[in-house]
């Protein structure tokens, strides 16, 4: 944490307001210094940041949570570190309060309870689907947010509550009187499943949802021999008895496997059946009272139309077949037509019967086509062809001479390739090397990790540009997606606004509100304003690989052969353009040239793709 003129900073985030303390974090409202967007920072206390056991589990949980999005869950952008303290950057929300605060002096209608429990079940189903559980569902861990005056479920402690159970109880004992503390702990224990002995899984969450639903409906906990909701709410249209009692089963295996489906059945499809059943009983009594004691002959009850539809019984004939020996029946040579006629009715069926043998067909394994990951496509901008000027008299020697070139029209990605796009390519090829054993990417220098054979993106970095990628990796990805790398000439023309010949992609000047440079890390693509052509991140964020080999004096040759120049035929280095997140301002000029070995790996190197006009 850094102090500047009495203003509190955490990395690139300026603290605006305190929001309070949660179970595992101090929450503050902050604004990014450069992109001027507000976030909520969840700052871990020093004792948790220094705990290896907690941080190991914390990192695993954050990775999983960052991969999902739900209105009732914390939307994680990234995780950062300031000194020895970690903090989680999350999306700004409108503020929340605990369910206990919301219920204070308030009685919810049945429809409100259905709305809240449905949202809770939806969020938990998503959490359970990625192998996590909440672990501590109760009136203080479940929060509500408000939209247009309607309360909505919000779960700020998903995945962490069970890790900090002892910390929670210790905090409760240190605040308030002993009587208040014991009462609150008792209420918390009411939500815990009977089998819980450090086991906080899906089944425990289901049990807690049952307790919460009962409390919201009845206003008390289902303790001991408790009355069913139907007794407390005789006018209810919903089968709360079925849903709540199924959640509160003592055996874990007997509880619903899918909370959302169990709630849907009890509050929609089955409610009509229950209502019909309750209405059918009086009708049955009326039928019994009105039933006559003596009935007429059955024939009198047959309608005229039914007589016309009588089905005549089919008469079956009994046929006696003279038995013959098997040898006689199997004789295939016939002396006369009479013998043929007399025996074919018996011999042919018998031959067929005796010749019938079990047929075992050869097992042929059904070939199943392996489903490979499909690419995530990027929107492209068409750059119109024509004659352009490139080079600069204000830069380095390799930017001279300034000369005109001619290019055909081409397409260019609006932003660099991101981690979530590149990870699909790696999953498809199944390796970090190409067929010639060239490295495509070095994972330890990127935001992509391999754990237990699976590729995982660091939390919050899915939309950041991929880094640590070599020229071989960039070129292979472009080929896989049906595109190519842009030439150095194409890149400079696109960055400078075509025929406008701008100094920077943003215009004649540039500052930190327009690009990510001289900072501490990459930012998500498209975080800054686009260029005049609609391209993002052409300045800063990451250097971008180009197709060309680099030559110090290539512009001299290009001036003589100006039609679609594509660099020298061979070389040692490949061209990089655009500057990066830690570059100085001068490196962001459209004409600035950078280069490195095609196998070089750097946390500032990325790329974008181009495509010819067909």
UniProtKB/Swiss-Prot annotation:
<keyword id="KW-0067">ATP-binding</keyword>
<dbReference type="GO" id="GO:0005524">
    <property type="term" value="F:ATP binding"/>
</dbReference>
<dbReference type="GO" id="GO:0004674">
    <property type="term" value="F:protein serine/threonine kinase activity"/>
</dbReference>
<comment type="subunit">
    <text>Interacts with PknD, interacts with and phosphorylates IncG.</text>
</comment>
<keyword id="KW-0418">Kinase</keyword>
<comment type="similarity">
    <text>Belongs to the protein kinase superfamily. Ser/Thr protein kinase family.</text>
</comment>
<feature type="binding site">
    <location>
        <position position="42"/>
    </location>
    <ligand>
        <name>ATP</name>
    </ligand>
</feature>
<dbReference type="InterPro" id="IPR016187">
    <property type="entry name" value="CTDL_fold"/>
</dbReference>
<dbReference type="InterPro" id="IPR042095">
    <property type="entry name" value="SUMF_sf"/>
</dbReference>
<dbReference type="InterPro" id="IPR005532">
    <property type="entry name" value="SUMF_dom"/>
</dbReference>
<dbReference type="GO" id="GO:0120147">
    <property type="term" value="F:formylglycine-generating oxidase activity"/>
</dbReference>
<keyword id="KW-0547">Nucleotide-binding</keyword>
<dbReference type="InterPro" id="IPR051043">
    <property type="entry name" value="Sulfatase_Mod_Factor_Kinase"/>
</dbReference>
<comment type="function">
    <text>Together with the serine/threonine kinase PknD, may play a role in specific interactions with host proteins during host intracellular growth. Autophosphorylates and phosphorylates IncG, an inclusion-membrane protein required for the modification of the nascent chlamydial inclusion.</text>
</comment>
<dbReference type="Pfam" id="PF00069">
    <property type="entry name" value="Pkinase"/>
</dbReference>
<dbReference type="InterPro" id="IPR000719">
    <property type="entry name" value="Prot_kinase_dom"/>
</dbReference>
<dbReference type="Pfam" id="PF03781">
    <property type="entry name" value="FGE-sulfatase"/>
</dbReference>
<feature type="domain" description="Protein kinase">
    <location>
        <begin position="13"/>
        <end position="276"/>
    </location>
</feature>
<feature type="binding site">
    <location>
        <begin position="19"/>
        <end position="27"/>
    </location>
    <ligand>
        <name>ATP</name>
    </ligand>
</feature>
<keyword id="KW-0808">Transferase</keyword>
<dbReference type="InterPro" id="IPR011009">
    <property type="entry name" value="Kinase-like_dom_sf"/>
</dbReference>
<dbReference type="GO" id="GO:0106310">
    <property type="term" value="F:protein serine kinase activity"/>
</dbReference>
<protein>
    <recommendedName>
        <fullName>Serine/threonine-protein kinase Pkn1</fullName>
        <ecNumber>2.7.11.1</ecNumber>
    </recommendedName>
</protein>
